[in-house]
Amino acid sequence: MATLKKPDLSDPKLRAKLAKGMGHNYYGEPAWPNDLLYVFPVVIMGTFACIVALSVLDPAMVGEPADPFATPLEILPEWYLYPVFQILRSVPNKLLGVLLMASVPLGLILVPFIENVNKFQNPFRRPVATTIFLFGTLVTIWLGIGATFPLDKTLTLGLF
């Protein structure tokens, strides 16, 4: 806030510029052509130049070539499917695993009905929804990390 300087509207030069439609966006400078024609292409080309420079200077390694005759011990899904994979892998009954996965959206649907007397939007004033969100986030992270461990170390994350 200390770096912002308010314009001096008593300055006749500034008032003349504003009367002609010149000045800062805050004072009604039109987006066309000022931003859309001049500023946006510069930002887009600068971003493109950064991406090209990074790809030329530090190319990503593709990895080792695939060997169709040697499969890994355990094939893992993509990282965003780790929690679901962990539920299916650790629960002995697969139907129970599918029901556990279906209970997540059903539980999220029930949260507004559990806390229907609280009309606040501030998360600190909605303790039930905040607690459920934080608990679900921690369980999801725990399941996601546990999916990368062998099955015997998956619940303790290899710590104990």
Curated annotation (Swiss-Prot):
Purpose of the protein: Component of the cytochrome b6-f complex, which mediates electron transfer between photosystem II (PSII) and photosystem I (PSI), cyclic electron flow around PSI, and state transitions.
Organism from which the protein derives: Mastigocladus laminosus (Fischerella sp.)
Subcellular localization: Cellular thylakoid membrane
Stored InterPro entries: Cyt_b/b6_C (IPR005798), Cyt_b/b6_C_sf (IPR036150), Cyt_b6/f_cplx_suIV (IPR005870), Cytochrome_b_C_euk/bac (IPR048260)
Membrane topology: Multi-pass membrane protein
Family: Belongs to the cytochrome b family. PetD subfamily.
UniProt subunit comment: The 4 large subunits of the cytochrome b6-f complex are cytochrome b6, subunit IV (17 kDa polypeptide, PetD), cytochrome f and the Rieske protein, while the 4 small subunits are PetG, PetL, PetM and PetN. The complex functions as a dimer.
Annotated protein name in UniProt: Cytochrome b6-f complex subunit 4
GO BP terms: photosynthetic electron transport chain
Residues in the Lumenal, thylakoid compartment per record: 57-94, 152-160
SUPFAM superfamilies listed in its UniProt record: a domain/subunit of cytochrome bc1 complex (Ubiquinol-cytochrome c reductase)
Record field: transmembrane: 36-56, 95-115, 131-151
Source taxon at top rank: Bacteria
Residue spans, topological domain Cytoplasmic: 1-35, 116-130
